[in-house]
UniProtKB/Swiss-Prot annotation:
One of its GO terms (biological process) is monoatomic ion transport. It comes from the Bacteria. This is Porin MspC. A constitutively expressed secondary porin, forms a water-filled channel which favors the permeation of cations and less efficiently phosphate. There are about 2400 porins in wild-type, 800 in an mspA deletion and 150 in a double mspA-mspC deletion. It comes from Mycolicibacterium smegmatis (strain ATCC 700084 / mc(2)155) (Mycobacterium smegmatis). Gene3D superfamilies: Porin MspA (Ig-like beta-sandwich domain), Porin MspA ribbon domain. Disruption phenotype: Single deletion is viable, and shows no effects on glucose uptake. A double mspA-mspC deletion takes up less of the antibiotic cephaloridine, glucose, serine and phosphate than the single mspA deletion and grows slower than wt or single mspA deletion. A triple mspA-mspC-mspD deletion grows even slower and has reduced Fe(3+) transport compared to wild-type. It is found in: Cell outer membrane; Secreted, Cell wall. The gene is mspC. One of its GO terms (molecular function) is porin activity. Octamers. Probably forms a goblet with the wide end on the exterior of the outer membrane and a central channel. It is not known if mixed oligomers of MspC with other Msp subunits form in vivo.
Amino acid sequence: MKAISRVLIAMISALAAAVAGLFVSAGTSHAGLDNELSLVDGQDRTLTVQQWDTFLNGVFPLDRNRLTREWFHSGRAKYIVAGPGADEFEGTLELGYQIGFPWSLGVGINFSYTTPNILIDDGDITGPPFGLESVITPNLFPGVSISADLGNGPGIQEVATFSVDVSGPAGGVAVSNAHGTVTGAAGGVLLRPFARLIASTGDSVTTYGEPWNMN
């Protein structure tokens, strides 16, 4: 009986440890700061761009075509400018993908989003020309979408899916469940999300995330 009790206790302890590990893993996966990169530009400002909470949810394609990959993208991109003249910074914040595909005949990518799926984060809209007291996200009709022909594979292509004008020393953009598809790709498709900050002076810095497999 003592031997059986020891076995049962060992099994329960192992199961509890496995469950605890599962909860820890699920709680930290794709949450928080994913990646960042900094650059000192020509005006001695430090430009930093970051990706946060990136999640690409690959789903079974609605057209049931074996050559189609479909996903929904959620996440945030932030930028920070430090140094002389940071308050006067102006530029563009871009989000997009590097897309890798092993074989294809004319791959095409489609990506779309509508407000309130996209939101300016930490943007200053209290001064001219807005003079508002809170952040608003007006509707875009019928929405915004991009479509691009990636050509024949194999290959790696980079596509900027959307961009926003930014100003000031810090800010960001958030996107929730933006819809994307790749058509005409045989085999697995890898998506590497990126965020890019481009200053009005032409300086730019890009941070790339881990690749996501859209099988």
